[in-house]
Amino acid sequence: MDRLDLTNASKLQERINQIDSSHFYSALTYYSWSFYGLNISYQFHEKGISFFGEINLEKNLLHEVLQDKYCPTQKVIFAPITKPNQPDDFLDLIKGQIEQLDNLQAIYIDDLTGIELEWVKSKYDVEIIHESSTNFLYETKKIMTLSGKSLQKKRNHLNFFIKQYEKDAKIKINREVDLNQLEKFYLTWINDCEDPSAYQSELALFRAIKPLIQDGSLKLTALYYLDQIIGFCVSYSLNNRCEIFIEHCDETYRGSYQYLLSNSLRIHHSNDALTDRQDDMGSASISYSKLSYKPEFIIKRYLVKVIC
C-alpha cells in the first residue's frame, strides 16, 4: 500500500474519478485526516481502491470522543471505493483486508455509508460503535444567495453587513491575499477561541496546503474590513461540487460570515451544483451551525467492530 501525502494525492484523485466521480470524499479530504491522528494508505485493485488507516491515539478525534470504546491496536479498514452499487466487489475488497489483519485483535471498519453498512452486515456480524455526520451538502445557488424563507435570518445578517460594513470592506482572492497577514489573523482567531488547542491540527493542515493555495489548486477568499483581514475561506472545486476545507470569520462583525460565504461561492463555485461543508468534527455547536443553513442532505457514516 502507498501512504497518502501531497505527492500522490492527484494520482489517487484521478483513480477515484475513474471509478466513481460522485464519491463524496476527495483525495485531499483523505489526506487532511493525517492532521487529526489518522494516516491513510491506499491500494489500487481491478475492483476498486482499498484503504487502511493507522491511528494515532494521542491525536485521533474519534478516540477522543469514544475513549475506551475505540482503541485500535492494528490498522483500521476504511470503506473501499468501487463502481456504484457493486456490493460483491465491495465485500471482496473488505474480505481481502480482513485477511491481512490479526483476528485475535479488534478489527474495525470505518466510514461505511448506510448502504455499505447493510452490505457488510449481510456477510459479517458487526457491532456499530459510532455514527457520524460526515458531509453536510447544500445547493450552491441557495446558500450563495441565502434565498428562501428558511434562510431569512441568514439573509438578514448578510443585509446588515452590506448596510453597515460593505463600503469599507473588500474581497481578495488567491494570490491577491498576503498569506503572512492571513496567518496572523488565523492565529489571533484561534487564540481568541475558548479552546485554542482544538484548532492546532487545522492550523497544521493550513500550513501544509499553502502550496496548493499558491498554485491555484485550492481557492482562497479573504474578507477585509478597513484593510484588515476579518475572515477567510479555503475551498476546492471537484466534479461539479465545492468542498470547503477551512472557513473562519470574526463574527463580531455581524453578517461577516454570510458575506464571505456568499462571495466565495459566487466567485469560485457558481457552476458547482453542490457545496460540501464536510463534517461536524463531533461538535454539537458545529453541527448546529451547519444544520442552520438547511442542507439538502447529510451523509451519515458508521464505524463498526467485526465480531469474529
Curated annotation (Swiss-Prot):
Recorded superkingdom: Bacteria
Classification via SUPFAM superfamilies: Acyl-CoA N-acyltransferases (Nat) (SSF55729)
Pfam families: LPG_synthase_C (PF09924)
Gene3D superfamilies: 3.40.630.30
Stretches of the chain forming a coiled coil according to its record: none
Disulfide bonds: none
InterPro entries linked: Acyl_CoA_acyltransferase (IPR016181), LPG_synthase_C (IPR024320), UCP018688 (IPR016732)
Protein name from the UniProt record: Uncharacterized protein MYCGA3080
Species per Swiss-Prot/TrEMBL record: Mycoplasmoides gallisepticum (strain R(low / passage 15 / clone 2)) (Mycoplasma gallisepticum)
Native organism taxonomy: Bacteria, Bacillati, Mycoplasmatota, Mycoplasmoidales, Mycoplasmoidaceae
